[in-house]
């Protein structure tokens, strides 16, 4: 028996099977088979067993049956193979794995390449640092590198350790870049990329293919590495440098992960450090930045490596940003990174240099631009940001374009884009696009443009696969738009997104401050924009670089007063520039935010500036915008990359332009870049901004579309402005140059916003398609989006966000943005939290509760007067008060969530509710007209939009144009589309969808949009959202059903994409949303489903609309219609839970916005037999209700 037990025990240990024969099966290890000793103790003394065997102290159960619980010994059995003694010694602990000493030696001694390979894995090993320190060898090359430029020299020597390598490396690539800018950039950089990617990569080119794909971070690093080498193109050591860089970069680049960490950590430290150097002296900043970076970066890199996993998708940007920033900062800080120090300078420097094969050119230009340093600094900063932050990164090129003088930096910006490209594949696509766009748009910086193109092309070519990969990733990021946003705007996001947000708000404010520092704070539309944009980007870049400092610092540095004052200035200026178009908006934008919104419309940059204040006020919006921008850029990038990448030259203006504008507006946060780039480089700005905008525009579009919807519908004038913009946009699209010029003249920002807006006529398509695809789902969003897009094809979306959202959000952004700011900021640490992070969700929820209700009421009400739409939006965003006032308590219930998510969703959700609620009421009032006009105007642009988003937008665009007369028709169509789409892409249960941002409207919309049932009760929800009674009447009678569906669907979908991180992450529905684009996910998913959805969904939607049009019936009828048409089964469910829920939704949903918010209707749609998420909504409705 004992033996048997022992044997059994052994086998049990080995096979995890207890001897069945023994009673030791009991909880107590009477004779635990796993204990060999047990047998002996059993045989001998129980005491022995107990004593001998740690866990089975007592062999005999009787002795201590309880004491000898198998539970613990069970663990030990894992070590059954070990002798009991050994087991006892080990307990269950496995010998502590120890890194072989080799690693340290290897890493330290080994070539950076090898070490890096290992180092990446073993980031904790100090050798990584030694490897990088080993790069000091690279430092010597930098001395030769100094030739590129004194700033670089300064940077190089100071930056010596990390940067020298890039300079060294740079020489070969720069010549290549210089000689064959496009190919060399592409070709030479690949080696650097290889080198950067991994020392071995330098050694083994084969790795290059893999590294690009392999290294989302590495490519950024690679780009960083290659760009840095290009930066010090002059560096003679270039030949050796590549390897050195390979080695050196490899430690930074090769050890992509920790390099990213290094970039992040070092950069943050560097940024922090650099932030002082930043202003002190660019050269010194460069030197300081690099020096601190080398030390900080490498030391910090040790710590950072663990995060590497996240970095892969989000950090690449940061890596690229920071590594290049760092390197560039060191290399290029002195030259052009005046405002933004090392951090930003580094990267643009690398990329500027890479962009500008000739470092001298870059540095020279940078130096030459040194006087224009603010600009160049901005440009580079923007370039840096672009490289550094995908969302900002895209703006980077824009800054460059805006800054012809910094044109050299622009190319560097382009290279940063490559960094961004690699770093952020979504942006990468944009990067390419921006680069290509930049070249296309940057004829001015043609020299850079070639290099830019080279950079762009190299990056593009370098990542031809990367391009595909980027597109794929963009799709993935679109799916995970938020995620990427979270990543981009998370890593960079918190840094870039939050800081871009903050940087765009704060950095932008700092930018303003920087501009203030740079005198051209608001002063020159062009320069301020550039300076502001650049500075903003620089600051934003700095913000990304100085993640916390920037965020904390910028907000402090650029206090709201500054924002206010700048905002006033911008308002004044925008009044002139934006008054052109924004005057209606302004008229409609009684609230400053409104004005600002209008201006944002017109002056994405200007308004961005305002938005900066607004951003300040609307950190959420900014955040949303930035992340949204990031998202949208991705969204755009996915579709826009092809459109943009494909028609970069042709469409870039459009795609780029309007994206630039939306980016501008969208990038309201990032808009400074866009604004800067937008006006000056509408294309590039749009291209880059398109990237940023695409990324940002997704959420931004969502937000902006929401805002625009809000503004547009809520702000009839805004909408008219939007229409005006839309029409002008179309006219401008046609007369984009003129408008762009005019706006640029007015203010680069305004131009940026409007040029895109103007361009949006032509380039609005992307915007439309972006927001449209994005929010196209929202038929009114289509209308709005289209108007938004139409109004500011780019500026519209961007500006709508800024305008609508700023109008709505600025008013409510204080609530919304502040909440977002809070949302973004960790309550304890004050750090910017990732968008999708649990803390962010918690903060968002808390903010929603607090601000949605308190600020929501105050802001919503406050904004309310400003523009119904706006206030509605705000109310919605702030929602609580307005959702009730809106008559869609449910609707606005969501808004409370929205306040925090207001930027995220509130823009969309709010917009939707606004569009629905205010729009319903307002539709009745004239929003409908406005909307119709918007729709009408968007219609042309819708075609443009769908032109771009042909499949996605086309249905939406066409539905809009088709049913344009009767928004309900477009709404219907959209609803149908949306519903169809919703049916197709059924978002996750609202709880999941909403978790990230539980905004009810967004959620409801999401739910609605998510699932046709939700859409069905989206009607209901819309009703609840917009006001069960009014929305049905208005929404359903009008396009609200459609708009709601579109809005709910599109918005929801968008929300799903933008709003619900969880949904986006976890759910296919959301991913659908995301994959299409942010817009694709939202718009494309909606759009695409809309495309095919209108036919299938059309009848349903129409039915719904019919039902929906009957205001009373609309609630139920649409629900039933949609239900019956779209969900026969769902209807049963709807009816059972849905009917009740619907009754509840209208009743409970209406009265309790909570229900609406939680989508009592969502409850209804909990179970959808035929859908992807059959049980999405029951939980949702009930859950939300319960939650509510």
UniProtKB/Swiss-Prot annotation:
Biased composition range(s): Low complexity: 432-441, 618-633, 689-703, 1026-1035
Modified-residue entries (Asymmetric dimethylarginine), positions: 1044, 1157
Ranges of compositional bias, category Pro residues: 139-151, 159-193, 208-240, 389-418, 640-652, 986-1001
Protein name: Uncharacterized protein C6orf132
Keywords: Methylation, Phosphoprotein
Top-level taxon: Eukaryota
PANTHER family listed in its UniProt record: SIMILAR TO AI661453 PROTEIN
Lineage of origin: Eukaryota, Metazoa, Chordata, Craniata, Vertebrata
Phosphoserine: residues carrying this PTM: 260
The organism of origin for this protein: Homo sapiens
Keyword Cell inner membrane: no
Extent of Polar residues compositional bias: 875-893, 1007-1019
Modified residues (Omega-N-methylarginine): 1073, 1084
Modified-residue entries (Phosphothreonine), positions: 666
Region (Disordered) location: 126-468, 484-771, 790-823, 847-1039, 1069-1160
């Amino acid at each position: 028996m004992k033996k048997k037990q022992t044997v059994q025990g052994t086998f049990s240990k080995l096979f995890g099977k207890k001897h069945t024969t023994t009673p030791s099966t009991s909880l107590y290890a009477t004779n635990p088979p796993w204990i060999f000793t047990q047998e002996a103790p059993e045989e001998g003394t129980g005491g022995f067993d107990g004593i001998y065997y740690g866990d089975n102290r007592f062999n005999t159960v009787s002795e201590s049956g309880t004491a000898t619980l198998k539970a613990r010994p069970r663990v030990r059995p894992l070590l059954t193979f070990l002798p009991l003694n050994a087991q006892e010694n080990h307990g269950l602990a496995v010998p502590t794995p120890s890194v072989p000493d080799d690693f340290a030696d290897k890493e330290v001694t080994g070539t950076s390449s090898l070490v890096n390979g290992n180092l990446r894995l073993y980031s904790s090993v100090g050798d990584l640092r030694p490897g990088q320190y080993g790069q000091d060898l690279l430092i010597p090359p930098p001395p030769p590198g100094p030739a590129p430029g004194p700033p670089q020299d300064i940077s190089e020597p100071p930056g010596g350790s990390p940067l020298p390598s890039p300079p060294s490396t740079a020489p070969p690539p720069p010549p290549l870049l210089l000689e064959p800018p496009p190919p060399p950039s592409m070709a030479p950089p690949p080696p650097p990329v290889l080198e950067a990617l991994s020392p071995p990569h330098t050694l083994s080119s084969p790795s290059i293919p893999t590294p690009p794909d392999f290294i989302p971070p590495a490519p950024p690093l690679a780009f960083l590495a290659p760009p840095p080498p290009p930066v010090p193109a002059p560096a003679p050591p270039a030949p050796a440098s590549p390897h050195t860089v390979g080695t050196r970069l490899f430690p930074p680049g090769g050890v992509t992960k920790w390099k990213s960490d290094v970039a992040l950590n070092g950069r943050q430290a560097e940024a922090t450090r650099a932030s002082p150097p930043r202003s002190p002296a660019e050269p010194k900043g460069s030197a300081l930045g690099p020096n601190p970076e080398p030390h900080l970066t490498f030391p910090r890199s040790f710590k950072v490596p663990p995060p590497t996993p996240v970095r892969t998708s989000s950090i690449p940007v940061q890596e690229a940003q920071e590594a290049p920033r760092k390197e560039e900062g060191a290399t290029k800080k002195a030259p052009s990174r005046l405002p933004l120090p090392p951090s930003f300078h580094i990267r643009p420097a690398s990329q500027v240099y890479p962009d500008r094969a000739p470092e001298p050119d870059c540095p020279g230009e940078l130096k030459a631009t040194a006087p224009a340093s603010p600009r160049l600094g901005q440009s580079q900063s923007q370039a840096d940001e672009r490289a550094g932050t995908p969302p900002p990164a895209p703006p980077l090129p824009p800054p460059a374009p805006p800054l012809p003088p910094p044109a050299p930096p622009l190319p560097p910006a382009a290279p940063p884009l490559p960094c961004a490209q690699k770093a952020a594949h979504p942006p990468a696509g944009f990067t390419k696009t921006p680069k290509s766009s930049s070249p296309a748009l940057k004829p001015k910086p043609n020299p850079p443009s070639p290099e830019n193109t080279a950079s762009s092309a190299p990056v593009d070519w370098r990542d031809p696969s990367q391009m595909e990969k980027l597109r794929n990733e963009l799709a993935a990021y679109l799916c995970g738009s938020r995620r990427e946003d979270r990543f981009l705007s998370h890593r960079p996001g918190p840094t870039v997104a939050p800081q871009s947000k903050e940087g765009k708000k704060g950095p932008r404010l700092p930018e303003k401050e920087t501009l203030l520092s740079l005198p051209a704070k608001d002063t020159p539309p062009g320069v301020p924009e550039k300076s502001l944009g650049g500075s903003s980007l620089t600051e934003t870049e700095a913000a990304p670089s100085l993640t916390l400092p920037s965020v904390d610092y910028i907000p402090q540095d650029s206090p709201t007063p500054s924002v206010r004052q700048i905002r006033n200035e911008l308002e004044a200026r925008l009044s002139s520039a934006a008054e052109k178009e924004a005057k209606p908006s302004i008229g409609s934008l009684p609230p400053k935010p409104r004005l600002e919104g209008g201006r944002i419309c017109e002056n994405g940059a200007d308004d961005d500036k305002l938005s900066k204040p607004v951003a300040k006020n609307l950190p959420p919006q900014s955040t949303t915008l930035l992340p949204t921008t990031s998202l949208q850029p991705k969204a755009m990038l996915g579709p826009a990359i092809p459109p943009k990448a494909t028609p970069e030259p042709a469409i870039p203006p459009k795609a780029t332009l309007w994206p630039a504008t939306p980016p501008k507006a969208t990038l309201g946060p990032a808009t400074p870049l866009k604004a800067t780039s937008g006006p000056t480089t509408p294309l590039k700005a749009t291209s880059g901004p398109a990237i940023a905008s695409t990324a940002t525009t997704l959420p931004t579009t969502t937000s902006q579309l929401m805002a625009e919807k809000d503004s547009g519908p809520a702000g009839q004038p805004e909408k008219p402005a939007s229409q005006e913009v839309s029409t002008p946009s179309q006219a401008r699209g046609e007369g984009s140059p003129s408008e762009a010029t005019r706006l640029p003249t007015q203010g680069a920002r305004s131009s940026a916003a409007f040029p895109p807006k103007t361009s949006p006529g032509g380039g609005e398509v992307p915007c439309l398609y972006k927001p449209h695809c994005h929010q196209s789902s929202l038929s009114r969003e289509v209308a709005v989006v289209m108007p938004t897009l139409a109004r500011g094809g780019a500026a519209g979306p961007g500006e709508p966000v800024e305008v609508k959202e700023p109008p709505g959000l600025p008013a409510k952004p204080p609530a919304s943005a502040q909440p977002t700011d809070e949302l973004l900021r960790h309550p304890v640490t004050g750090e910017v939290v990732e968008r999708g992070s649990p803390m962010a969700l918690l903060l968002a929820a808390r903010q929603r509760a607090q601000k949605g209700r308190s600020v929501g009421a105050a802001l919503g009400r406050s904004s309310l007067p400003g523009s119904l739409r706006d206030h509605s939006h705000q109310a919605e965003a702030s929602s609580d008060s307005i959702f009730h006032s809106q008559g869609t308590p449910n609707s606005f219930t969501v808004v409370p969530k929205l306040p925090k998510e207001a930027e995220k969703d509130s823009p969309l959700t709010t917009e939707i509710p606004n569009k629905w609620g205010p729009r319903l009421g307002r539709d009745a009032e004239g929003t409908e007209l406005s909307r119709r006009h918007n729709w009408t105007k968007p219609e042309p642009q819708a075609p443009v939009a769908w032109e771009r988003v042909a499949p996605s937008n086309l249905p939406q665009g066409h539905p809009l144009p088709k049913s344009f007369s009767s928004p309900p028709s477009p709404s219907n169509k959209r609803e149908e589309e949306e519903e169809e789409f919703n049916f197709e892409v059924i978002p996750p249960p609202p709880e999941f969808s909403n978790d990230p941002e539980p905004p009810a409207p967004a959620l409801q919309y999401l739910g609605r949009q998510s699932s046709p049932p939700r859409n069905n009760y989206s009607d209901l929800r819309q009703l609840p959202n917009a006001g069960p009674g009014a929305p049905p009447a208005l929404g359903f009678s009008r396009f609200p059903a459609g708009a709601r569906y579109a809005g709910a669907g599109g918005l929801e979908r968008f929300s799903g994409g933008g709003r619900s991180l969880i949904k986006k992450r976890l759910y296919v529905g959301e991913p659908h949303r995301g994959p299409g684009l942010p817009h694709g996910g939202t718009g494309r998913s909606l759009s695409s489903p809309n495309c095919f959805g209108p036919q299938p969904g059309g009848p349903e939607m129409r039915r719904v609309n019919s039902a929906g049009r009957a205001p009373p019936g609309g609630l139920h009828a649409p629900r039933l219609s949609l239900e019956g048409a779209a969900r026969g089964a769902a209807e049963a469910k709807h009816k059972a839970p849905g009917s009740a829920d619907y009754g509840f939704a209208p009743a409970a949903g209406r009265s309790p916005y909570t229900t609406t918010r939680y989508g009592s209707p969502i409850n209804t749609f909990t179970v959808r037999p035929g859908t992807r998420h059959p049980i999405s909504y029951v939980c949702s409705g009930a859950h939300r209700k319960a939650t509510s």
